[in-house]
UniProtKB/Swiss-Prot annotation:
SMART domains: PCRF. The keyword Protein biosynthesis applies. InterPro entries: PCRF, Pep_chain_release_fac_I, Pep_chain_release_fac_I_sf, Prokaryotic/Mito_RF, RF-1. The keyword ATP-binding does not apply. One of its GO terms (cellular component) is cytoplasm. The gene is prfA. Methylated by PrmC. Methylation increases the termination efficiency of RF1. The modification N5-methylglutamine is found at residue 238. Keywords: Cytoplasm, Methylation, Protein biosynthesis. Pfam families: PCRF (PF03462), RF-1 (PF00472). This is Peptide chain release factor 1. Peptide chain release factor 1 directs the termination of translation in response to the peptide chain termination codons UAG and UAA. Gene3D superfamilies: 3.30.160.20, 3.30.70.1660, 6.10.140.1950. One of its GO terms (molecular function) is translation release factor activity, codon specific.
Length: 367
């Protein structure tokens, strides 16, 4: 059963919802476009919580009625039927309680943002670079399934078709909310194409996921930037190495360096490089802020400093294991083609469960 503090909060939200419903029916509000739109937005934000709370109250009433029936009923068959229904209602109540708690959690302000993903080959030489390319294709496939757009910012390919590093933007509603869990060290176990003896090797690649920041969200003083141009080696056809379209930007105070050379024009490369710089600076400032308050758990991941592996792709066993939630799938090919939702959905659920646990530990400590 929900704690009194939570019930009080939900009743407060329901009361406000009813107030808004009443206001939206008034002529003076209907005629005031801005006020009407503002109230519609406020109602939309809390409508799901109110619907879920009303469902909770209905189920609670059903549970109480069934408990009374079990207690009072003389007929054994009817009592047995009521007990079965009671078990079913109890399960539904627990599910709705969890959903209500999850709805009350503060939203991550970056969840709806586009993202910048960076994949870097780790230990394993050429095989690690090939694995980095596999991961890029996996995320490309996932983005396509979601109807999101992918733009390469910069890449450092190898002779065998791998990537020492590839940086790309994923544009689409909720991209950060789904892909933020991919940050960390990914590990592959397989026989490399460069291996003649057939021995299984272990290689790694690091994935970083950063929310794309608007100019107003991350202030950059132009005086803090050193901008250089160079001859691009990107997809420029006859323009390759003939025009200085590549752009390298250094943020002097932080030492962060970003470069982009995949577009034909210097202007496009500069624009993309600035997007990456804003995202990296946001992460840099977040980390500084967390260090100042001695936070033990960094919220921003993907800096390449995390040594623990988050997921292993085992080719001989066709198995993918996410070590954070101790979950394995034996659909390796499907996962690498972009079927990631079975992992992402479980990771989102695990995060919510952890947040709820912490929230109610705090509530318990203050009540």
């Amino acid at each position: 059963m929900l704690q009194k503090l939570v019930i009080d909060k939900l009743e407060e939200i329901e009361k406000r919802f009813e107030e808004i419903e009443g206001l939206l029916a008034k002529e003076d509000v209907i005629s005031d476009f801005n006020k009407y739109q503002s109230l519609l937005k406020e109602r939309a934000k809390i409508e799901e919580i109110v619907d879920k709370f009303r469902e909770y109250k209905r189920l609670l009433k059903e549970k109480e009625d069934l408990e009374e029936m079990v207690k009072e009923e003389q007929d054994e068959d009817l009592r047995s039927l009521a007990e079965t229904e009671l078990e079913d209602i109890q399960e539904k109540l627990e599910k709705v309680e969890f959903e209500l708690k999850a709805l009350l959690l503060p939203k991550d302000p970056n969840d709806e943002k586009n993202i910048i993903m960076e994949i870097r080959a780790g230990t394993g030489g050429e095989e690690a670079a090939l694995f980095a390319a596999d991961l890029f294709r996996m995320y490309l496939g996932y983005a396509q399934k979601k109807g999101w757009k992918v733009e390469i910012v910069s890449s450092n390919p190898t002779g065998l078709g791998g990537f020492k590093e590839i940086i790309f933007i994923v544009e689409g509603k909720g991209a950060y909310s789904r892909l933020k869990f991919e940050s960390g060290v990914h590990r592959v176990q397989r026989v490399p194409i460069t291996e003649s003896s057939g021995r299984i090797h272990t290689s790694t690649a690091t994935v970083a996921v950063l929310p794309e920041m608007e100019e107003i969200e991350v202030e950059i003083d132009p005086k803090d930037l050193r901008i250089e141009t160079f001859r691009s080696g990107g997809a420029g056809g006859q323009h390759v190495n003939k025009t200085e379209s590549g752009v390298r930007i250094t943020h002097i105070p932080s030492g962060i360096v970003v470069q982009c050379q995949d577009e034909r024009s210097q202007h496009q490369n500069r624009e993309k490089a600035m997007k990456v710089l804003r995202a990296r600076l946001y992460e840099y400032y977040q980390r500084e802020k967390e260090n100042e308050i001695a936070s033990q758990r960094r919220q921003q991941v993907g800096t390449g400093e995390r040594s623990e592996k988050i997921r292993t792709y085992n080719f001989p066993q066709r198995r993918v294991t996410d070590h954070r939630i101790n979950y394995s799938s034996f659909q390796l090919e499907e996962v690498l083609s972009g079927e990631l939702d079975e992992f992402i959905d479980r990771l989102i659920l695990a995060e919510k469960e952890e947040q709820i646990k912490k929230l109610f530990e705090e509530v318990g400590a203050t009540s």
